[in-house]
Amino acid sequence: MSVPQETVNRIARELFEAKRDVHTVPYVSPQLPERDLDAAYAISAEFAALRERELGVKRVGRKVGLTNPLVQQRVGIDEPDYGVIHDDMVHASGTHLPLSRYNRLLIEAEVAFVLKSDILEATREAVEAAIDHVTPAFEVVDFRYDGSVGQIVDTIADNAGCSGVVLGEEQHPYGEVDLTKVEMVITGGGTEITRGVGSNVLEDPVNAVIWLAGTAIRTGEPLRAGEVLLSGSIGYIEPWPADVECVATITGLGRVVATANSKG
């Protein structure tokens, strides 16, 4: 990483305050060498650490994003990224999300994996053995930037856009459902928003977890028992419509429900 630590700390502080106070900041990419992913992840790590130190939140999971070629094409990025899920970011199905807490709320539906043991080896066998159950989930996506997503370093530095997760109503043992063949539909107030199939996510959502496990091991922060892991969007990422009930249904896994409220 060629970026001074004081620059990393300053940018992380700006993103932390933007999230806390709900305002936007300029892209970080002009301040970093082109495609310096190490610097972007260092900023993201300090951003997460600031939340943990100053707000007292705890890490309870991770997300891997940009696993769907539809989403990659939409944002002009060609590789996955990852971020952190803190305990104050986790919601139950049926939750109401105040839009006043977000800059520009976006909606995704995906398969969430919950671990029963640590993952210390990034193999399919080790990952599958560590999974306790799967459930449908919304990722609550929000960025701290003045414009749209920006470059990959902008996305990574901003916790990969992850601002929360809404977990589904049902829990299913891993292997009970063929995740490559599940079909997902999101509706808002009964109107279809997006749809997709499980194979959109790196051909199989568990492949996203394998990728995440390897990345986590390389960075010295392996995935731990109890963590919630978001595997990436099955359909497009779309604006979250206000004041209507949004429902994501994934065949064989059930549904997840949430409403973004313009008041309150």
Located regions from the model:
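Catalytic-core "active-site belt" of small-molecule-metabolizing enzymes
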Residues: 2-204, 241, 245, 255-261
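Buried hydrophobic packing segments
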Residues: 47-48, 167, 209-216
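Active-site scaffold segments
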Residues: 112, 209-210, 230-232
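Short alpha-helix capping/helix-loop boundary micro-motifs
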Residues: 33-34, 214-216, 232-233
